[in-house]
C-alpha cells in the first residue's frame, strides 16, 4: 500500500490529492457496504461456521465473524484495483492489482472462510463502488470546472 500511496502522490497533476481521497473513499465505502450492510442483512454463515459442511472443509487458521456474504477482502481489493486502473489507465502495472485481487479472493475460499459466491459478490461490489465514484467525479468536474 505504501508503494501505491507513493505512486499517487508523486503524480504531476493538480488533482493527485483528490484522486488519493477518492481511492481511499472507494476502499472504505466498499468495506462498509459488505461489512456493515450486506453481512448483517443476509446473515449467511461462513463455511467454517456452517454446521452442515464445516466438518468437510479444511479450515486453515481461525474462523472469525459469523457471516461471510459478501467478502470484504474481495470487495476492498477489487475496489482498489478498479479505481487505480481507472485513474491510471496508461500505467499497465495496475493490471497486476487485479491478479493480486484474484489471489486474495481465492485465498478466502481456500482458507474455508468464504464460499465462491461470497467472493464473487464482494469483487463485484468493490468494482461497482469504484466505477461509481470514478464516473461521479468525471460528471462533477465536467459540469463544474
Located regions from the model:
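Transmembrane alpha-helix/helix-exit interface in multi-pass inner-membrane proteins
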Residues: 28-48
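Membrane-interface interhelical connector segments
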Residues: 42-61
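Generic beta-strand or strand-like secondary-structure segments
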Residues: 24, 36-37, 79, 83
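Membrane-embedded catalytic cores of phosphoryl/pyrophosphoryl-handling enzymes
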Residues: 57-145
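Hydrophobic residues in alpha-helical segments
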Residues: 9, 41-42, 109-110
